[in-house]
Amino acid sequence: MSHTNQPDLVLYHAWNSSASRKVRLCLAEKGLTWQGLVIDINKFQHHTDWYKRINPSGIVPALLVDGHALIESNLINEYLDEAFPHPPMMPADPLQRHEVRRWSKYIDDTCLPAVQKPNWSLLMRPIAEKWSDAELAARLAAIPSRERRDLWTRMARNPFSRAEIDTALDILEDMTRQIGVYLAKSGGPWIYGDRFTLADIAAAPYVVRFEEERPGHLAAPVAAWWQRFLARPGWAAAEIGGFSADNDRSVAEAVPDSGIAG
């Protein structure tokens, strides 16, 4: 769907970032035109002063709307649904909207910390474990978030064990079971019934990573939901590939180190 008189949308993102993938999916499902500027997390562009002026949290994504910065992927997607209401991606009923928000919060509170364990172990550990104490201290000084500072310290000095990663994947598997519960309750074909919503989008980046780590572990109703999702035009338009391949793409397509003004 085309949107007349849409504002200028600039998305700062990384191809393999789960939160960035959520926003790209929403932009794609809305049929919006946007400019993408890729941040190379491996080179810590998200911790640079110029990027922290856009997103003080020093994380991706950030969406500029006519130059106004929006942050936090769930909040960005709710803005997009309110600003561009067709097709709608939130239920009309306030109680059902609450359920979608509750699901999205569960994803952020539970599944994001879980997926960080395999993701960071794969990509960040090889970088961080080479740092001297002085290099680690310098990197940590540029990171606004205490949680992220703790993660980088963990990667550098006490990386996640195989058991911790397996427990994290168990959490993601439980998320897929919860999708099955919602599908059974709503009757499908989507998490909250016949309408594709932000709840489906919130889960998708975590399902794709779970499928990469534990292929073939989706229960039949969830696997059918997932195939329906993959068949949507928005999935192809969001350009979600393999985790490592998308990391390489972010490295190749990153903005200059000096940054680009939105």
Annotate each PLM feature:
Residues L11, R21, A184, Y192, ...:
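C-terminal or late-domain output modules
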Residues N5-Q6, L27, F44, E72, ...:
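Short linear sequence motifs
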Residues P56, K105, L112, W120, ...:
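Generic surface-pattern signal
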Residues M1-P144, K185:
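GST-like domain detector, emphasizing the conserved glutathione-binding G-site
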Residues G31-T33, Y51, P144-M155, S250-D257:
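Short alpha-helical hairpin
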Residues P87-A92, A114-V115, P189-D194, A236-G241:
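Short, hydrophobic secondary-structure boundary micro-motifs
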Residues C111-Q227:
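GST-like fold's C-terminal all-alpha helical module
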